[in-house]
């Protein structure tokens, strides 16, 4: 049975392939600077972050390649669907993430976009390194073995 989500946390977009392609070592929550039509479009539950990433742009951390569709009820005041969006973090967190990406070969990947209990749009970021092909195969084998083990224990018990 799947775990029940937090009552105040409504997930809008989920990057399920991120944990397959990257070995995530650390996660943190960041705010995201959005326009009004982007927020309304997110509340409709439509966003894609499968191919997006976060990276430095000057002194800030930006979310690149995240797709938030146009809000249909807005006419000429709509937003660009794949524009870079500023991530709202403390300076110490920004410096840590930029340092890890530049010096140690890490990548900052968005894992989820959700609304918290106060109705603010947040992004869950993961700091990780890319997996090689043999690491991905090993992850699949381990996941299959865990499923078989759980199935055997459930059938015996």
From Swiss-Prot:
Entry-linked Pfam families: SmpB
NCBIfam families: PRK05422.1, smpB
HAMAP family: SmpB (MF_00023)
Keywords noted in UniProt: Cytoplasm, RNA-binding
Name of the protein in its database record: SsrA-binding protein
Gene3D superfamilies: 2.40.280.10
Matches recorded under InterPro entries: SmpB, SsrA-bd_prot, SsrA-bd_prot_CS
The family this protein is said to belong to: Belongs to the SmpB family.
Gene responsible for this protein: smpB
Biased composition, class Basic and acidic residues, residue ranges: 132-157
Region named Disordered: 131-157
Compartmental location: Cytoplasm
Top-rank taxon: Bacteria
The protein's role, per its UniProt record: Required for rescue of stalled ribosomes mediated by trans-translation. Binds to transfer-messenger RNA (tmRNA), required for stable association of tmRNA with ribosomes. tmRNA and SmpB together mimic tRNA shape, replacing the anticodon stem-loop with SmpB. tmRNA is encoded by the ssrA gene; the 2 termini fold to resemble tRNA(Ala) and it encodes a 'tag peptide', a short internal open reading frame. During trans-translation Ala-aminoacylated tmRNA acts like a tRNA, entering the A-site of stalled ribosomes, displacing the stalled mRNA.
Primary localization: cytoplasm
GO biological process, alphabetically ordered: trans-translation
Matching SUPFAM superfamilies: Small protein B (SmpB)
GO molecular function, one term: RNA binding
CC annotations in GO: cytosol
